[in-house]
Amino acid sequence: MFIHPEEILETLKMVNNEHLDIRTVTMGISLRGCCHPDMATFNSNVYDRILRCAEKLVRTTEEIQSLYGMPIINRRISVTPIAIVAESCQADDYCSVAETLDRAARETGIDFIGGFSALVQKGMTPGDLKLIESIPRALAITEKVCSSVNLASTKAGINMDAVALMGRIIRETARLTADRGAIGCAKLVVFANAPEDNPFMAGAFHGVGEPDCVINVGVSGPGVVNAAVRGLQGSPTLGDIAECIKKTAFKITRMGEMVGREVARRLDAQFGVLDLSLAPTPAVGDSVAAILEAMGLESCGTHGTTAALALLNDAVKKGGSMASSNVGGLSGAFIPVSEDEGMIRAVKRGSLSLDKLEAMTCVCSVGLDMVAVPGDTPAATLSAIIADEMAIGMINKKTTAVRIIPAPGTVVGDVVEFGGLLGSAPVMAVHNFSAETFIGRGGRIPAPIQALTN
């Protein structure tokens, strides 16, 4: 294949000036063969299995990074939802499993490990309930473990009992990690229609339909797209902007696929998916909000933001799907408040509210992500925010999620500092009117008519 010198220079510019990188190489590992009634034996099986599969993951990605000159920011692992594989154990909680995952993550040198998870969209088994009730302490005593719970799906409806429970779990997680800015909540996400091959944290888990061991890759390129849109000459129409984004997404995706396939080949693992998601960072310019403003919005969150985000999300998918036959995961545009310099600025200047973020989640990749709210926000209000987001996902047959941080002691206008890629989050206002009676009714919101597809 002939590569033009201009293409090489263009790629170097993307990496050096526009923050292009591989955000994550995530190894998915099946733990189904680790089940055992004795918890100590189970934990030993899990630890040995992870080390056997992932012992060369970090070294291999570093070699690939040196070979291609392409930064790989995170190396991660996802495992089979622990609520499924640990249910065979005779134990009151699963905190020891979280400690085992954390120990394996430290030993392999990876950044995060996901899969302390439960899938409860239609109901909870005893194992699901044990895992969910273990989440606050598990996230408080570990450093690298991430947790997720799927509460709803288009086919099953919304498990409102689990939604109500998760409001309390999030509050307790914030309390137990209050001395660290409620960091536990940044490692906990709830889903509707959770994908089984997502490489991004905190929602990554290795689905039961996945291979024994698989490599999934997530690419990051908001800075590249932002530079491309701002570099358009004259007065481009929105159609011109969409075409520009599509072509840029194509280039980004090809690079990610090349890296992912080579990592999988060297590790003798199956190549899974390439997640097209535009994942921002706190760096100036590496921002989804900045792309929306480059289209002509004065500030992200003003009227027109949802339309601009829909254009961006669709163009990224079209360009990426032309570049790879293995597109999966979440694949769209992330709008995490704390991780996006432009979003942070928009919240501080008053153009972006929680309600507008909810509207934006109807057309983008995931949902309400890394949103800080006052520390005294009631559990029922957190559950109601989750229920709204689950409804959007259920009705629209898409993945939606909530990662919300009720940081203890904070009020609207405060800033919660997380550091690193997690950035900092301005505390946003929630409605003062109660939804406690609604949430307290429990039960299940039935699946919509859209579920009847056969």
From Swiss-Prot:
Belongs to the UPF0210 family. CDD domains: RNR_PFL_like_DUF711. Pfam families: DUF711. This is UPF0210 protein Ppro_0613. It comes from Pelobacter propionicus (strain DSM 2379 / NBRC 103807 / OttBd1). The lineage of its organism: Bacteria, Pseudomonadati, Thermodesulfobacteriota, Desulfuromonadia, Desulfuromonadales. PANTHER family: UPF0210 PROTEIN MJ1665, UPF0210 PROTEIN SPR0218. HAMAP family: UPF0210. Homodimer.
